[in-house]
A protein has these predicted regions:
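Transmembrane-helix bundle of Major Facilitator Superfamily
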Residues: 2-169
Length: 169
């Protein structure tokens, strides 16, 4: 089976930087969201009366995100990066809004799963977009930037969650 050669779009630097900034912000939000419940989850479970389901807050998100990553990568090859990214962003944002309005632990967990599906679309599509937008000589730098965004998002989630928990109690 031959390897398909990906050709990048030759667009101006300002446009590609703007696109990458948007992708990086969405990826930051997804990574942040996957770790924030580590510190604030106890308070959420207590407020929603669902301590028995506490572990499912993170599990639902991460399980759905993990399942969606390879699926989203393939779907973005078939249907295009932009449309799939927008769908992922809509799913992630909708899940986040409804999670904030949850009145029960079960509802919150379902919303976390929805967020995970959206996040599982955002991450691989953002990474694949690098090949579409940058020459092979620049891809390593941009992938490194995305790796940093992933690390920062995953790292600040628990910090901000801890701050919110401290301020709420």
């Amino acid at each position: 089976m031959a390897v398909e050669q990906v050709t990048y779009k030759n667009i101006d630097r300002g446009t590609s930087n703007m696109i990458m900034a948007g992708l990086a912000i969405a990826m930051l939000a997804s990574c942040f969201d996957s770790t924030i419940v580590g510190t604030i989850g106890f308070e959420i479970a207590k407020d929603l009366g669902g301590m028995g389901l506490y572990a499912w807050m993170a599990t639902a998100y991460l399980l759905c995100e993990t399942v969606m990553i390879p699926v989203a990568g393939k779907l973005s090859d078939i249907y295009g990066r932009k449309i799939l990214f927008l769908i992922g962003l809509a799913i992630f944002t909708g899940g986040s809004i409804i999670a904030g309005l949850s009145v029960s632990m079960e509802m919150f967990i379902v919303c976390r799963a929805i967020q995970g599906f959206g996040g599982g679309i955002l991450i691989p599509v953002a990474m694949a977009a690098v090949a579409d937008l940058f020459a092979p000589s620049d891809r390593g730098k941009v992938q490194g930037l995305f790796g940093a965004v992933f690390g920062i998002g995953s790292g600040i989630g628990p910090l901000i969650g801890g701050y919110i928990e401290g301020a709420a109690s």
